[in-house]
C-alpha cells in the first residue's frame, strides 16, 4: 500500500511545474543511507502538496467508494437465500466487522503511542465499517425484494459519506501530527494542537453517534419484522 501511494504521489508530483526538480532531488536523497535514517525527511515528503493531495484522494475519496462496495460482496454472494431485512442487517454488520478486523491488523498509516487514541481509532473505525456495511446490506435486500435501486443507492451514499468523514478526520490528525513535530513552542504549535484536539473530539462524537445508530437501526428493524410477523398471523 505504501509503495502504491509513493508511485501515485510521484506521478502526481511530476505533473506540477516544479515536480520534476523535486523528483530528481528525492531520487538523489534516496541513495543516501543517512538521509533515509532521518524520520524528518519522510515527514517532509509526506507534507509535500502533491503527496498530501494524493493521500486525501486515496483515503477520503477512493477508499470509501471501493471499500463500501467490497463489504457488500459477501452479502451479495449469500443473497441466493433471499434474506429477510434483519438477516441482511446481521450479514452486513458481520461483513463490516470482519473487514475492520483485517484492516486493523494491516493498517500502519497512523502510528500513535497514546493508548486511548489507538482504542478510539480501532473502536470507532470498526463501528463505522459495521454500520456502513449493515446499511448497504439492507439496501441490497430491499433491491432484491422490491427491485427499487433507490434505497440501495441511498444506503451506499450514506455509508460512503460516513466513511469519508471518518477517514478525513484520521488523515487530518496524521497531517497535524507531522506538522507538530516540526514546530517549536509558540502560536504555530498551539494552532496544531488545537486542530488535533478538535479532530479528536469529532472522532469521539462520531464514535458515539455510530454506536447509537447501530442500536437504533437494530431496534427499528426488529420492530418492522415484528409488525410483519403479527400481520402475517392475522
Q: Where in the sequence are the language-model features?
A:
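Hydrophobic alpha-helical segments at protein termini of multi-pass membrane proteins
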Residues: 1-234
Amino acid at each position: 500500500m505504501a509503495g502504491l501511494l509513493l508511485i501515485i504521489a510521484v506521478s502526481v508530483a511530476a505533473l506540477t511545474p516544479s515536480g520534476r526538480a523535486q523528483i530528481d532531488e528525492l531520487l538523489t536523497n534516496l541513495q543516501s543511507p543517512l538521509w533515509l535514517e532521518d524520520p524528518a525527511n519522510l515527514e517532509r515528503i509526506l507534507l509535500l502538496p502533491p503527496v498530501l493531495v494524493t493521500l486525501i484522494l486515496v483515503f477520503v475519496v477512493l477508499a470509501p467508494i471501493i471499500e463500501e462496495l467490497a463489504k457488500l460482496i459477501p452479502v451479495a454472494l449469500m443473497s441466493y437465500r433471499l434474506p429477510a431485512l434483519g438477516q441482511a442487517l446481521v450479514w452486513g454488520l458481520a461483513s463490516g466487522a470482519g473487514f475492520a478486523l483485517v484492516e486493523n491488523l494491516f493498517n500502519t498509516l497512523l502510528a500513535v503511542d497514546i493508548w486511548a487514541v489507538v482504542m478510539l481509532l480501532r473502536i470507532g473505525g470498526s463501528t463505522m465499517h459495521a454500520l456502513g456495511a449493515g446499511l448497504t446490506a439492507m439496501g441490497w435486500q430491499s433491491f432484491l425484494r422490491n427491485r427499487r435501486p433507490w434505497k440501495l443507492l441511498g444506503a451506499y451514499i450514506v455509508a460512503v459519506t460516513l466513511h469519508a468523514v471518518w477517514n478525513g478526520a484520521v488523515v487530518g490528525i496524521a497531517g497535524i501530527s507531522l506538522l507538530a513535530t516540526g514546530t517549536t513552542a509558540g502560536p504555530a504549535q498551539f494552532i496544531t494542537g488545537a486542530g488535533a484536539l478538535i479532530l479528536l473530539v469529532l472522532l469521539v462524537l462520531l464514535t458515539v453517534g455510530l454506536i447509537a445508530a447501530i442500536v437504533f437501526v437494530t431496534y427499528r428493524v426488529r420492530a418492522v419484522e415484528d409488525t410483519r410477523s403479527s400481520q402475517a398471523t392475522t
